[in-house]
Regions:
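Short acidic/glycine- and proline-prone juxtamembrane loop motifs at membrane-interface regions
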Residues: 43-49
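Specific aromatic-rich, kink-prone transmembrane helix
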Residues: 50-67, 288, 292
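Membrane-interface alpha helices of multi-pass inner-membrane proteins
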Residues: 71-103, 117-121, 314-315
Length: 333
């Protein structure tokens, strides 16, 4: 269901908001769903797969507000914020940015404020109930089971020290391990290799070595591609993205997307949250790439436009079948 609605919303963004032809919209939609961890997010029951359609829906509705010169209705804000923030608070912040971009003044009216505050209070109540009704009793049962196991087997759990040491090394050095917020930071993992190999690498094109391994268990933080062609493709996508941002620099929709992108990059690359496995968060930001490329296509004409669309189609088809082959092979093995 998430995959179907993600395709529909992405396609409508390209046609309704950017005014692209159907063939061009299909090419960009294919490119989006050829990204490795977009494909995986649609296959795995996790919140990343649910985040994508809600973020795309937010973009679609925001774009329509921009075109009409209207604001989000309070009930729309309440629904969007409840479901986006319910998946992850960072998504809720992105929804708030969309509300702000649509109507910078009206967003501070009491109805608009309540449309965010009330869902937030409801989410807090649900979180508290979940913690005391399910999580805490489960932790107590697990602790009891571990204690019983240790009584029967004195050696039980002694090997965990090696696992903990490995994970501490993989997760990098935090600014302050005792601080509730700063413990999620990472100031030791190199940024440039993270961008090349993980953010713009594994997120889009799977590595053949250490295929789909977990960085918390056995995967190195950085894995290099076997051939230079993968870095060329990675660079081409980045170049098309930058060109698209330039062509869309006068669009309010582009600036909204850039605010989302800047927030994610500040959180992951700057603060270091999840930097060692940043590719698993691809569904939160990678859809901005084909939308930006769509701005470039919209402003081009003639041969240049045809060349860009052809390049996007070729990249999308190649990446789709390349990543799909590895995913299917992994599942079969």
């Amino acid at each position: 269901v998430s995959a179907v609605y993600s395709v529909i919303f992405a396609y409508r963004i390209f046609t309704d908001l950017l005014g692209l032809a159907r063939t061009e919209a299909r090419s960009l939609t294919l490119l989006l769903f050829s990204f490795a961890y977009i494909m995986l997010s649609m296959m795995v029951p996790d919140h990343f797969g649910l985040s994508l359609p809600w973020l795309l829906l937010t973009v679609l509705l925001a774009g329509r507000c921009f075109k009409r010169g209207t604001a989000f209705k309070p009930w729309q804000q309440a629904v969007l914020f409840f479901f986006t923030a319910g998946l992850t608070l960072t998504n809720g912040l992105k929804s708030c940015l969309a509300f702000l971009f649509a109507a910078p003044r009206r967003v501070w009216r009491w109805r608009s404020v309540l449309s965010v505050v009330l869902p937030l209070a409801l989410l807090f109540g649900i979180r508290q109930y979940q913690q005391f009704a399910y999580e805490q009793p489960m932790k107590e049962r697990v602790a009891m089971m571990i204690e019983i196991k240790k009584q029967k087997d004195p050696n039980f759990g002694k090997g965990d020290a090696k696992i903990v040491a490995w994970r501490e090394k993989q997760n990098g050095t935090a600014i302050d391990k005792d601080n509730l917020l700063l413990q999620w930071s990472d100031i030791s993992t190199p940024r440039l290799p993270s961008v090349i190999h993980n953010l713009m690498g594994e997120s889009l094109i799977l590595h053949s070595q250490h295929l789909l391994e977990d960085v918390q268990n056995n995967r190195p933080v950085f894995v290099a591609y076997d051939q230079m062609v993968f870095y060329v493709v990675e660079g081409l996508i980045a170049l098309l993205f930058i060109i698209g941002v330039w062509y869309g620099r006068r669009s309010r929709l582009m600036w909204l997307l850039l605010s989302w992108f800047a927030f994610d990059m500040l959180m992951h690359v700057g603060f270091g949250f999840g930097l060692n496995e940043v590719y698993i968060m691809t569904a939160h930001w990678a859809f901005i790439i084909p939308i930006a490329i769509g701005f470039a296509i919209r402003h081009l004409s003639g041969t240049k436009r045809e060349l860009v669309v052809s390049a996007v189609s070729a990249l999308g088809a190649w990446m789709f079948f390349y990543n799909l082959a590895f995913i299917v092979g992994y599942c079969v093995d």
